[in-house]
Amino acid sequence: MILRTPQPKRLRSDAGESPFPTGATGSGNQLIIYEDSPLPAPAPLQTSHDHSADQHLCTYQCRQMVKADVLDALSTAEKQVEESKTKLQTLNANFTEADAERKHFRDKFLYSEQELAAAKAREKMLQEQLLMEINNSQERYTKELQSCHELEVKLQNEMNLRKKAESSAATAEEKAKLLEDKLTQLSGSVDREKKRLNNDIAQLGKEAKLSVARIGADLERMQCRAQNAETESNLLRSQLEHLKLIFDECLQEKTEVDKKLSSFTSEAASSSDNSVLVKHLQEELKRYEAEVREARKLKSRHLDAELLNVNLLEEQSRRERAESELSKFHDLQLSMEKLENELSSWKSLLNDIPGVSCPDDIVMRFSVLQNEVVQSTMKIGEASTRIKQLEETLEAIQLGRQNAVSEAALAKEKSEALKTDVKRIEVMLTLVTEEKEQLKAVVNELRKSNSEGSVSGAADGALIQGFESSLAKKENYIKDLEQDLNQLKDVNNRQRTEIELLNEKLVDEARRNKSLERDSDRLRSEISLLESKLGHGDYSAANTRVLRMVNTLGVENEAKQTIEALQAELQKTKERLQAVEELKSQSGDAGKLVDSHITGKIAQLKEQNATLEKREERYKTVFADRISVFRRACCELFGYKIVMDEHQRPNGIPVTRFTLQSIYAQSDDEKLEFEYESGNTSILNNEYASQGDIAKQIEIFIRKFNSIPAFTANLTMESFNRRTLY
């Protein structure tokens, strides 16, 4: 049996992994006996019952305990050696990393120094540029102030000129007002004269109407007399014809009696019967002679009646001529009065116009006044153009001043921004110098540590922390610099956008100035045109009053033409009356003349009728051609053949019937019939319209929506689809 002490093992928290119970190991380092073949589960010795065994084994137990402590110390020392080796390796690795980081940081430090030098150079350049811009802006501002003062002086001068122009314009306006007052007075006098003349014309019209009525009554009376005379002449003609017949019979009887007397003279010389017959015949002769005298008297009366008719017509024509002459005389009197009024008005105008002594001076005076008006308008136009130019220059000055103020404000903002940038750069420089000093201290510590040859873990940790803090500061500094760069880029972009906007505004202003210059040139050309029109004497119908004569040349020519036409018609009527009288006087030739006249009229009317019939036939042919073209076009465009038929209802109302047949119809029975009456169109029922589909479409499109075109279009589409698709 060999007593052995097992190697110290760490107790595990898990009870199943430890080979011994926890009570045996924790009860005061009790001795465990191992054999060559140890038992799987040795039980601990019970020392509570046998005190003598415990006393016997005390020294051995102490030795074993010391041995175990030594072994534990040895194992811990080995472990510490291994740990120190690993730490040494890690420190060497950390040292190499720190050296690399030191080199990297030194490179960064040198790069930051270079950036700092570049920033200082940029700062100097920016300061110099800012000073140059400030000096330039101050110079521009002084120049703008000087130009403003000069323009103010010019403006004052222009204002004085404007006041002078306004005073001259006021005087011209006063003159124009005076002239307008005179014109209003003249227009008032002209209106009064017009009213008076209108009243005179109305009175003359009334008098003319009364005279016309009186003359009409006289004419009717004379016509009645003429009709009575004609009736009397007709009666006398009939009596004359009767007497002529009687006279002819008497002459025949006289000739017979003369023959008898000549025959009886040879037979019987003097007998009582013959004497009685002679006496009787003598009495009849006397009676016949009396009748002949009466017939001659009637004939003379008839001739007197015809002469009276002729005299009546002559008197009527004379009366008409006298009336026309009277109307002309009245018109001449009116024109004379108007001319006298115009002369009086012109005399008053001559008296009112200063510097005019005779009518020849009016033209000169008017030309002088026109020249004065033209000069005043030119002065007013020049003053207005100067005022516009001054306004434009003022606007330009104000814009320049605003631009200068804005530029000064921008320069101030830039200077403030540059000051803030300088302050920020100074702060950054202080931070960089602090970091530089820290890095120098770190480098010195590293050099000292390298010179000493041994570096403790705490010093390495402090160095690493210092490097990490410097790295973090450097990263923060880089981020700040990047943010500053971004801000500067944004500022530059804003400034560029502002510059672009200002350039666009400048371009717009230049375009506006050019457009204003073009407008000013156009207005000047219009002013020159108006001045030339004023010089030539052009006028507008809305503003200029023109004196017009009542009886102008056109009116007089029209009156002359109407008078000539009336005279020609009167001459024709006279000729016709003479022809009728000749026809009446010459009964034998009258029939022939009337027949020839009637035949001529009939031939003329036949010729006119023939020409009219030819024209009507030509119109009918042209209309038929056009209507056929129209029907074909309607058929091609709308798809329906249209046949029109007109008839009358029993009550006499005309009705037009239209028959429509689609070009896509499958049979001749597919026809639609419509009636058109006084603006209303209605569909008629037939076999095709009474079909189910057609009746439904008629109910929807015509009865409900009152749209015949929609019905025909839908029907066309359905028939087209049936014809082509099915």
From Swiss-Prot:
Q: Which organism is it from?
A: Arabidopsis thaliana
Q: Which UniProt keywords apply?
A: Cell cycle, Cell division, Coiled coil, Mitosis, Nucleus
Gene3D superfamilies tied to this protein: 3.30.457.60, 6.10.250.90
Q: Which gene encodes it?
A: MAD1
Q: Name one GO cellular component term.
A: nuclear envelope
Please verify whether the record's keywords include RNA-binding: no
What assembly does the database describe for this protein? Homodimer. Part of the mitotic checkpoint complex (MCC). Interacts with MAD2 and NUA.
Please list the coiled coil stretches: 68-246, 272-625
| InterPro entries noted in UniProt | Mad1
Name the record gives this protein: Mitotic spindle checkpoint protein MAD1
Q: Which Pfam family, any one of them, does this sequence belong to?
A: MAD
Question: Positions of the region Disordered?
Answer: 1-30
* Role description: Required for the execution of the mitotic checkpoint which monitors the process of kinetochore-spindle attachment and delays the onset of anaphase when this process is not complete. It inhibits the activity of the anaphase promoting complex by sequestering CDC20 until all chromosomes are aligned at the metaphase plate. Required for anchoring MAD2 to the nuclear envelope.
Q: Which domain of life is it from?
A: Eukaryota
Localization per Swiss-Prot or TrEMBL: Nucleus envelope
Q: Which SUPFAM superfamilies match?
A: Mitotic arrest deficient-like 1, Mad1
Write out the GO biological process terms: cell division; mitotic spindle assembly checkpoint signaling
User: Belongs to which family?
Assistant: Belongs to the MAD1 family.
